[in-house]
């Protein structure tokens, strides 16, 4: 098998910088496709966390003037990841996270910051670095949406480009006056270019101009072609349906392995699943919950937002707790939801615990100790927490949308009888149906044999990158051979 070279371009990558599932995907993809003959490097911005976490950085190119300041490209490693780092302090060295400042507002120069990333990716793809000529480019989300535009309007030969939508809700829309500042010609500002409702649409540009589009589950690929999930881009996505496909994410099964996880109190596997009881006990103590081994303990690991359906959870919480259930929540996001769960923890001491923020170790501990994991999203491109939940024996209770629908087998009578059920699904996504799903979950939990089968079925489900990597490698080769 001939080795292909691929350059992935992304705004975050695990373990260096992470705000969500995008980082998990970009961090796991290189090793996954390597098994299928694809040598992948990843271009990422030089945030402080990235510069502080890389090994053996070597300058391979410098720019005297690059989007308002000097910059350089560093070749570096982090564990098994082969990286190119865009070290541009005027763009990336600042407090806050990659997209917002300490005041929780978008950085005012985000248009320039991520145009720079896309431009660097395009130049590398077109031979900027001697001796490195990637066969394929793979761009991720709105932050790299201009990459295929830079390729298209350069007038120079370029490799084919795959563009992946991780979440269509984040679109990167900016004023048209920035066109010259981001280095695009006037002809790019057209309906079949980067123009979007009178401005510049970074995500729209990627969808319009990439050679192939992927998103992170087959169901989501269909949903976004409709008005409810299409976010205004459904017409374009229907137009490009022949170039659009859904490839499920996987999880890094070395990072997420309950039999060897150093972040949890007690490791276990399918044969020793009873050891989860120790993790549940520790989790109850960590969240200030009553030490009741028989209480149905729900976990939530989520961004706190309308998309994630956590407002519905607050609405149904009193009824859920009346049945004796417990809730351990880890997340951050919209201020009203943060306040709502803080208040719930005060109102229901011993039954509700909330940690506002993100803590990787605590996320592992919730997966290992919760009886069930709640994911009541109104839409969910793929979702990773439910995949980790399957692997850890925390029964997922999910809305029947996107990747949640594709990865969790509902415990209906037939699925239970045939031994394939792995969780609970509900639809439509309303508070009433969430309540019904919680009631169903309680009934399943009370049937110890059925519940154990759900756990074992989940833990033996292949949630690794093996199958997704095959699909990506096949897609890359199709484009290169076309």
Curated annotation (Swiss-Prot):
Chain residues that bind ADP-alpha-D-glucose: 18
CDD domains in UniProt: GT5_Glycogen_synthase_DULL1-like
GO MF annotation terms: alpha-1,4-glucan glucosyltransferase (ADP-glucose donor) activity; alpha-1,4-glucan glucosyltransferase (UDP-glucose donor) activity
SUPFAM superfamilies in alphabetical order: UDP-Glycosyltransferase/glycogen phosphorylase
Cited InterPro entries: Glyco_trans_1, GS/SS, Starch_synth_cat_dom
Reaction catalysed by this enzyme: [(1->4)-alpha-D-glucosyl](n) + ADP-alpha-D-glucose = [(1->4)-alpha-D-glucosyl](n+1) + ADP + H(+)
Source taxon at top rank: Bacteria
Pathway this chain belongs to: Glycan biosynthesis; glycogen biosynthesis
EC number: 2.4.1.21
GO cellular component, one term: cytosol
Family to which this protein belongs: Belongs to the glycosyltransferase 1 family. Bacterial/plant glycogen synthase subfamily.
PANTHER family with a match to the protein in the record: ALPHA AMYLASE DOMAIN-CONTAINING PROTEIN (PTHR45825:SF11), GRANULE-BOUND STARCH SYNTHASE 1, CHLOROPLASTIC/AMYLOPLASTIC (PTHR45825)
Function: Synthesizes alpha-1,4-glucan chains using ADP-glucose.
Protein's name according to its UniProt entry: Glycogen synthase
UniProt organism field: Rhodopseudomonas palustris (strain BisB5)
Lineage: Bacteria, Pseudomonadati, Pseudomonadota, Alphaproteobacteria, Hyphomicrobiales
């Amino acid at each position: 098998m001939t080795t292909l070279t691929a350059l992935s371009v992304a705004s975050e990558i695990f373990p260096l910088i992470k705000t969500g599932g995008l980082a998990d995907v970009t961090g796991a993809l290189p090793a996954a496709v390597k098994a299928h003959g694809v040598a992948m490097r990843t271009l990422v911005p030089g945030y402080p966390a990235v510069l502080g976490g890389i090994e053996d950085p070597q300058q391979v190119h410098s720019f005297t003037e690059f989007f308002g300041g000097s910059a350089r490209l560093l070749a570096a490693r982090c564990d098994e990841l082969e990286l190119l780092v865009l070290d541009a302090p005027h763009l990336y060295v600042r407090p806050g996270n990659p997209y917002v400042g300490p005041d929780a507002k978008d950085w005012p120069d985000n248009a320039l910051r991520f145009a720079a990333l896309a431009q660097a990716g395009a130049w590398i793809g077109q031979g900027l670095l001697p001796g490195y000529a990637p066969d394929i480019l793979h761009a991720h989300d709105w932050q790299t949406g201009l990459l295929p535009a830079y390729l298209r309007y350069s007038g120079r030969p370029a490799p084919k480009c795959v563009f992946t939508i991780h979440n269509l809700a984040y679109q990167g829309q900016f004023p048209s006056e920035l066109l010259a500042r981001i280095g695009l010609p006037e002809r790019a500002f057209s309906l079949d270019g980067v123009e979007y409702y009178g401005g510049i649409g970074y995500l729209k540009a990627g969808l319009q101009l990439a050679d192939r589009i992927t998103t992170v589950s087959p169901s989501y690929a269909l949903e976004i072609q409709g008005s409810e999930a299409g976010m205004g881009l459904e017409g374009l996505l229907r137009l490009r349906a022949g170039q659009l496909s859904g490839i499920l994410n996987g999880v890094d099964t070395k990072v997420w392995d309950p039999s060897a996880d150093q972040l949890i109190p007690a490791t276990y596997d399918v044969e020793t699943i009873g050891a989860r009881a120790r993790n549940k006990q520790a989790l109850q103590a960590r969240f200030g919950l009553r030490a009741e081994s028989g209480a149905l303990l729900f976990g939530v690991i989520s961004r706190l937002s309308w998309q994630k359906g956590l407002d519905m959870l607050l609405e149904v919480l009193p009824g859920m707790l009346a049945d004796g259930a417990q809730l351990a929540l880890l997340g951050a996001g919209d201020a009203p939801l943060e306040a709502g769960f803080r208040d719930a923890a005060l109102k229901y001491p011993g039954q509700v615990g909330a940690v506002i923020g993100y803590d990787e170790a605590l996320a592992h501990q919730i997966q290992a100790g919760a009886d069930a994991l709640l994911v009541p999203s109104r839409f969910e491109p793929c979702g990773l927490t439910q995949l980790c939940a399957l692997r850890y024996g925390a029964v997922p209770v999910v809305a029947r949308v996107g990747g949640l629908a594709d990865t969790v087998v509902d415990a209906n009578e037939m699925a239970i009888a045939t031994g394939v059920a792995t969780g609970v699904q509900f639809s439509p996504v309303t508070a009433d149906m969430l309540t019904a799903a919680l009631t169903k979950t309680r009934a399943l939990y009370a049937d110890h044999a059925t519940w154990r089968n759900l756990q074992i079925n989940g833990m033996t489900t292949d949630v690794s990158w093996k199958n997704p990597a095959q699909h990506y490698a096949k897609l890359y080769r199709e484009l290169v051979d076309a």
